[in-house]
């Protein structure tokens, strides 16, 4: 019996060592050497402190900053653990809204969000990504159109020329991956950090 089982046991042990130890360590080591920034989570630092990741969005609400997409993520209610409360961009609980196209709650939220945005920029059409949440609730990017829609509000709040803010958006716009995958996008956290630097120095960066 043991003789018949030995090949299976040897293969099991060998594959466990190869796929569970050697391969993960080799890939981790290669990533640390070839792509250290990405391997560490694409973390963004400022003043020696980690302030976020380029891969996970953050909730910006002040007029002086660009805002990301709506986020449907939640967190446990501190008053009642059996319930949840809205917690935008909660990376511990990635999720979408799960509201279907016929949902009244979704329609009401969309109408409210569109009205709020139109009040900020009445002459422009509201970009769809500014009123729709991503499937993960953690999308760090918005479209260039969504960024430009917010220029009047941001420029007014910071007392900056709109042309300079638009130039900053252009400099921070990333193209399609490999030239054909996805859509052009702007990372909201990186854009806001560049905006802070521009305001501090008086020059676009």
Swiss-Prot record:
Superkingdom, natural source: Bacteria
Keywords carried by this UniProt record: ATP-binding, Cell inner membrane, Cell membrane, Ion transport, Membrane, Nucleotide-binding, Potassium, Potassium transport, Transmembrane, Transmembrane helix, Transport
Membrane-crossing segments per the record: 7-27
Bilayer topology: Single-pass membrane protein
Classification via Pfam families: KdpC (PF02669)
InterPro entries: KdpC
Subcellular location: Cell inner membrane
Keyword ATP-binding: yes
One Gene Ontology cellular component annotation held by this UniProt entry: plasma membrane
GO molecular function, one term: ATP binding
Family classification: Belongs to the KdpC family.
Function field: Part of the high-affinity ATP-driven potassium transport (or Kdp) system, which catalyzes the hydrolysis of ATP coupled with the electrogenic transport of potassium into the cytoplasm. This subunit acts as a catalytic chaperone that increases the ATP-binding affinity of the ATP-hydrolyzing subunit KdpB by the formation of a transient KdpB/KdpC/ATP ternary complex.
Quaternary assembly: The system is composed of three essential subunits: KdpA, KdpB and KdpC.
Name this polypeptide is given: Potassium-transporting ATPase KdpC subunit
Organism the protein comes from: Nitrobacter hamburgensis (strain DSM 10229 / NCIMB 13809 / X14)
């Amino acid at each position: 019996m043991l003789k018949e089982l030995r090949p299976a046991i040897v293969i099991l042990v060998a594959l466990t060592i190869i796929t569970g130890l050697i391969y993960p360590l080799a890939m981790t080591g290669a990533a640390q050497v070839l792509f250290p920034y990405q391997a560490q989570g694409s973390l963004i630092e400022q003043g020696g402190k980690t302030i976020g990741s380029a891969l996970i969005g953050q909730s910006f609400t002040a007029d002086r900053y660009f805002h990301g997409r709506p986020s449907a993520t939640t967190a446990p209610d501190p008053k009642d653990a059996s319930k949840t409360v809205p917690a935008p961009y909660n990376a511990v609980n990635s999720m979408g809204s799960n509201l279907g196209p016929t949902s009244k709650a979704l329609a009401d939220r969309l109408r409210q969000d569109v009205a709020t945005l139109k009040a900020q920029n009445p002459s422009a059409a509201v970009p769809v990504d500014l009123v729709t949440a991503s499937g993960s609730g953690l999308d760090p990017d918005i479209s260039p159109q969504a960024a430009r829609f917010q220029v009047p509000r941001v420029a007014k709040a910071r007392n900056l020329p709109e042309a300079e803010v638009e130039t900053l958006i252009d400099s921070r716009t990333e193209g399609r991956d490999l030239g054909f995958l996805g859509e052009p996008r702007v990372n909201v956290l990186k854009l806001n950090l560049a905006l802070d630097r521009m305001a501090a120095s008086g020059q676009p960066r």
